[in-house]
């Protein structure tokens, strides 16, 4: 596929780690720096009328730079695709962390909530409203710090932040009353309500307003009455009351939230919402490395970087900066490499870009070790990258003054967003304090990635020449990433979901349709490619036994010691729950459908051997669909198994 040619010059694609209505997210490795990234891939034709929202998200992320907001690195647009290269957050969703704990303690909630406040206050200070705040849109990085994602529904009102918005959007369970009534509203006030729902979920483990019936849920939200669990402290109850006010004019403001007594408890200062990482000053080490690599002067390189075009040069600079911040040398790779353990396979020419279109998961290459990209190199040297230097020399005479951001050409904005010049934001005086750490295990965890048991070369025609004489190295199946130590999910209360997308023109009932195995054509296409590439036994297949993993917050422990028995138990219960599935070794790729045949949920269940004797577990990962429906469904499946 020609749409992928340019992308594959700079990145090696691996497995799909998330899907949505019109997009999928793949794990990838940036070739020059060896850093892991997440690439959001969107089809323009499928987006249709939602294309302006993608432009809005890109514009927002280009102008937002904050320690608790997922960083945009690179935007690539072709005739049919839009690629957004984003910061990879291996820690997983806040939602998964909450349900693994049942609920968080008030102290831990405060640490998490202050980070959410910091991100949202900064977003508001830049004139934006997020409008889709929920646990699924908050990810943990490798340091267990939160990052806000998904700005597809954000709005930058015409005029100023006091301009009233009209669009009803977001998720019903988190939406403010004035928004679902169809009234005009202030984005900042609606976000405060959503943060109130978030705060409740953090401390309680379930939604304050929840019902299977949409109209019943609507009435509950409008009444503003919710259960107050006995374990909530008086100060937390008061804060929830102030945030979950049905009348937005009586709702607490963001300014007062930042120094609220509950938020300030155990802290000596209000929440520090200003950006700690502004792009007003370029890092000398990173600029020098890029200058040497592209054989250009420092001044030329500084001018090119400072134009912030969010092309490959911007991505390389920001990834070098991230690498340096993690204590790694700000150096670019000079050798041909692939991110993973060594594996000799047939030449990569056997896998063409045309093969890429046969499956969503055709780039699956196994469980990724976050550090392997920069450590595992092959001997043969690759030709120097000269294309960008040529472009840079041509652009040097035209490049804007340092610090000026280029506006996106042909912007498509909705009625609530306006094209405004972007400028660097000066930091105000920052509060200095040391945040207490969230109680996690000694080893920081990394996000579990759905893995394919077969390793195969990356389908990159653009890089075929420099890899022609070298064996291809792709990610192998690791034993799993360092993880949090938590137990079995046993929620205080079973949560139903009414996390309804308010942008949908129709509502659907709970999935009831029974079907046969799905993903057939996709899987068959992928299997043909894999069979052509390797004749040996697939590692990770049923004959090899389950993969070994460390205990993670999305792994449920069992009392069974026989993995085959557990796998049989799960496969027997899935049809009873109206779940279609495809088996690949000890991994079950599952999905549910509506009565109209629409896929409503996709997730994986993998039987794994935990890294201690005679203990078998189940790894769970949601790929698509409502988080609370997923939670309830997986609980029903696991409770039906004899574990």
Curated annotation (Swiss-Prot):
PROSITE patterns: KA1, PROTEIN_KINASE_ATP, PROTEIN_KINASE_DOM, PROTEIN_KINASE_ST. Residues 326-643 are annotated as: Autoinhibitory region. Keywords: Apoptosis, ATP-binding, Calcium, Cell cycle, Cell membrane, Kinase, Lipid-binding, Membrane, Nucleotide-binding, Phosphoprotein, Serine/threonine-protein kinase, Transferase. Expressed in testis, ovary, thymus, spleen and T-cell. Expressed by neural progenitors: highly enriched in cultures containing multipotent progenitors. Autophosphorylated: autophosphorylation of the T-loop at Thr-167 and Ser-171 is required for activation. Activated by autophosphorylation of the T-loop at Thr-167 and Ser-171: in contrast to other members of the SNF1 subfamily, phosphorylation at Thr-167 is not mediated by STK11/LKB1 but via autophosphorylation instead. Inhibited by calcium-binding. Kinase activity is also regulated by reducing agents: dithiothreitol (DTT) or reduced glutathione are required for kinase activity in vitro; such dependence is however not due to the presence of disulfide bonds. Its main location: membrane. It is found in: Cell membrane. Gene3D superfamilies: Kinase associated domain 1, KA1, Transferase(Phosphotransferase) domain 1. Its EC number is 2.7.11.1, 2.7.10.2. Residues 282-321 are annotated as: UBA-like. The modification Phosphothreonine is found at residues 56, 167, 486, 510, 531. Residues 11-263 form the Protein kinase domain. Serine/threonine-protein kinase involved in various processes such as cell cycle regulation, self-renewal of stem cells, apoptosis and splicing regulation. Has a broad substrate specificity; phosphorylates BCL2L14, CDC25B, MAP3K5/ASK1 and ZNF622. Acts as an activator of apoptosis by phosphorylating and activating MAP3K5/ASK1. Acts as a regulator of cell cycle, notably by mediating phosphorylation of CDC25B, promoting localization of CDC25B to the centrosome and the spindle poles during mitosis. Plays a key role in cell proliferation. Monomer. Interacts with ZNF622 and PPP1R8. This is Maternal embryonic leucine zipper kinase. The gene is Melk.
């Amino acid at each position: 596929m020609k749409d992928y040619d340019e992308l594959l010059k700079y990145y090696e694609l691996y497995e799909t780690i998330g899907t949505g209505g019109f997009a999928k997210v793949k794990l990838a490795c940036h070739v020059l720096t060896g850093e892991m990234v997440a690439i959001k891939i969107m089809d323009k034709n499928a987006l249709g009328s939602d294309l302006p929202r993608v432009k809005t998200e890109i514009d927002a992320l280009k102008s937002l730079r904050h320690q608790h907001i997922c960083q945009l690195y690179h935007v690539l647009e072709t005739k049919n695709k839009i690629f957004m290269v984003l910061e990879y957050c291996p820690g997983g969703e806040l939602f998964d962390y909450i349900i693994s704990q049942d609920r968080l303690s008030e102290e831990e909630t405060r640490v998490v909530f202050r980070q959410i406040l910091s991100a949202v206050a900064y977003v508001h200070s830049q004139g934006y409203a997020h409008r889709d705040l929920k646990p699924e849109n908050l990810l943990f990085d490798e340091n267990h710090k939160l990052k806000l994602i998904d700005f597809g529904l954000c709005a930058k009102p015409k005029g100023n932040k006091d301009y009233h918005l009209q669009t009803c959007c977001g998720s019903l369970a988190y939406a403010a009353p004035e928004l679902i009534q169809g009234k005009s509203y202030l984005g900042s006030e609606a976000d405060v309500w959503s943060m109130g729902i978030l705060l409740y979920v953090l401390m309680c483990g379930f939604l304050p307003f929840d019902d299977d019936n949409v109209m019943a849920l609507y009435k509950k939200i409008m009444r503003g009455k919710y259960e107050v669990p006995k374990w909530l402290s008086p100060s937390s109850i008061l804060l929830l009351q102030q945030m979950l006010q049905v009348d937005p004019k009586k709702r607490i403001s963001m300014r007062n939230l930042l120094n609220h007594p509950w938020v300030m408890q155990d802290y000596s200062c209000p929440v520090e919402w200003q950006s700690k990482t502004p792009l007003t000053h370029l890092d000398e080490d990173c600029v020098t490395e890029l200058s040497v690599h592209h054989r250009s002067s420092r001044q030329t390189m500084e001018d090119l970087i400072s134009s912030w075009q969010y092309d490959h040069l911007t991505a390389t600079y920001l990834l070098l900066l991230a690498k340096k911040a993690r204590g790694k040398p700000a150096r670019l790779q000079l050798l041909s490499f692939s991110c993973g353990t060594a594996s000799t396979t047939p030449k990569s020419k056997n896998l063409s870009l045309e093969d890429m279109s046969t499956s969503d998961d055709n780039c699956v290459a196994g469980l990724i070790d976050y550090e392997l990209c920069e450590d595992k190199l092959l001997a043969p040297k690759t030709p120097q990258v000269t294309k960008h230097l040529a472009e840079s020399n041509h652009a040097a005479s035209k490049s804007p003054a340092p610090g000026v951001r280029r506006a996106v050409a042909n912007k498509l904005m909705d009625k609530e967003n306006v094209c405004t010049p972007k400028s660097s934001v000066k930091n105000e005086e920052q509060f200095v304090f040391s945040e207490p750490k969230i109680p996690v295990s000694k080893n920081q965890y990394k996000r579990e990635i759905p893995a394919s048991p077969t390793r195969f070369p990356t389908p990159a025609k653009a890089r075929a020449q420099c890899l022609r004489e070298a064996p291809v190295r792709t990610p192998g199946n690791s034993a799993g990433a360092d993880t949090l130590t938590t137990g079995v999910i046993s929620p205080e209360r079973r949560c139903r979901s009414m996390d309804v997308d308010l942008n949908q023109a129709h509502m659907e009932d709970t999935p009831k349709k029974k079907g046969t195995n799905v993903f057939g054509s996709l899987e068959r296409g992928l299997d043909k490619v894999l069979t052509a590439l390797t004749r040996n036994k697939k590692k990770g297949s049923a004959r090899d036994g389950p993969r070994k993993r460390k205990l993670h917050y999305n792994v449920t422990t069992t009392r069974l010691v026989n993995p085959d028995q557990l796998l049989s138990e799960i496969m027997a219960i899935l049809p009873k729950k109206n779940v279609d599935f495809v088996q690949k070794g000890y991994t079950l790729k599952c999905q549910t459908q509506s009565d109209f045949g629409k896929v409503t949920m996709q997730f994986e269940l993998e039987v794994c051997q935990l890294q201690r004797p005679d203990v078998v577990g189940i790894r769970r990962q949601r790929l698509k669909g409502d988080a609370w429906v997923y939670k309830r469904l997986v609980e029903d499946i696991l409770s039906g198994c004899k574990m």
